[in-house]
């Protein structure tokens, strides 16, 4: 029962790829932030990646790190911190865990412009859309 672990408000997940050469530095920043905020992630997963995908593929060289946070009074600060981190270091976010994705984050994917162009060709009349596609303007 998720309510038992996270309460009725639930949780949110943040997941992104950190390039190998920035991993230690960014991990220290995250640790310092969480300590300062006196908050913690109930679940953390770190995986090694070394492949390159196509378009908006989440893989890349480095480590993916995923955090689950209970939605509480710290939500805004946590969301702002991770969004700033993604922007500052041009991190690639897992689009299926898209809470912190916005239009500017999408440009961290070198193939985003090509993907956007192909989507507009396939969906020129904008008959198919979602909150996600509206947020990314695709």
Regions found by a protein language model. Give the residues of each.
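Activity-critical C-terminal alpha-helical subdomain
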Residues: 93-138
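Substrate-recognition/cap regions that form aromatic- and gly/pro-loop-enriched pockets
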Residues: 1-109
């Amino acid at each position: 029962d998720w309510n038992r672990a996270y309460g009725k408000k639930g949780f949110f997940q943040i997941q992104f790829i950190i390039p190998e050469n920035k991993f230690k530095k960014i991990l220290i920043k995250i640790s310092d932030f969480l300590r300062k905020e006196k908050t913690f992630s109930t679940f953390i997963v770190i995986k090694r990646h070394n492949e390159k995908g196509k378009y908006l593929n989440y893989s890349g060289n480095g480590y993916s790190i995923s955090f689950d946070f209970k939605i509480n009074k710290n939500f805004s600060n946590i969301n702002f911190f991770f969004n700033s981190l993604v922007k500052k270091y041009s991190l690639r976010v897992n689009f299926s865990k898209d809470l912190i994705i916005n239009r500017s984050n999408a440009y961290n994917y070198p193939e985003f412009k090509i993907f956007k162009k192909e989507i507009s060709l396939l969906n020129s009349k904008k008959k198919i859309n979602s909150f996600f596609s509206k947020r990314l303007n695709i």
